[in-house]
């Protein structure tokens, strides 16, 4: 399941291109993912409680189907992606200009994501476009939440579990 199809963020990227604003990628290159999976030093970046939240989010995001021995490597990839995006944000800084990071909710969380990799002197604000009334966004520390109409309920995990194994949507 492609969580970030181009159609979801194309309007933001294309508006920036049309306005002549530089657009840069910030994700961790695929070539560095295997090394990140094995980099246990990443485990120390977050406090233990936050690392536990990140583990839960990764497990849930993979529909509970990730084998236990693959969970921490996937958490490390998430942490490495956040670090890579933070470096891209810092590298894009220009005096008097704003840097906009377009990323998923897990990456913009102040307690788990990219902001944890930014230096203390760096001022950042978080805006979330939220479909419906998801408690995670409402309870987040975002500076701004832009509400959009709720999406139709869908079990995104059903295709991963296989035919006949769908669970009711909550």
Regions found by a protein language model. Give the residues of each.
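A substrate-binding/cap region within the structured catalytic cores of diverse enzymes
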Residues: 1-94
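Glycine-rich anion-binding loop/nest that anchors nucleotide
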Residues: 73, 77, 96-107, 125-128
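C-terminal regions of proteins
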Residues: 84-93, 107-170
């Amino acid at each position: 399941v492609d969580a970030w199809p181009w159609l979801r963020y194309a309007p933001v990227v294309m508006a920036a291109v049309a306005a002549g604003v530089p657009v840069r990628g910030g994700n961790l290159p695929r070539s560095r993912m295997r090394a990140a999976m094995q980099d246990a030093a990443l485990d120390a970046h977050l406090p233990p409680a936050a690392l536990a939240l990140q583990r839960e989010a990764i497990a849930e995001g993979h529909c509970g189907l990730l084998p236990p021995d693959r969970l921490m490597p996937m958490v490390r990839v998430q942490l490495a992606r956040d670090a890579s995006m933070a470096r891209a944000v810092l590298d894009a800084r220009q005096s008097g200009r704003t840097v906009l990071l377009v990323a998923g909710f897990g990456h913009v969380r102040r307690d788990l994501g990219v902001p944890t990799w930014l230096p203390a002197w760096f001022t950042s604000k978080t805006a979330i476009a939220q479909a419906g009334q998801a408690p995670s966004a409402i309870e987040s520390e975002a500076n701004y939440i832009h509400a959009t109409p709720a999406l139709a309920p869908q079990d995104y995990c059903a295709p991963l579990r296989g035919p006949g194994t769908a669970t009711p949507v909550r």
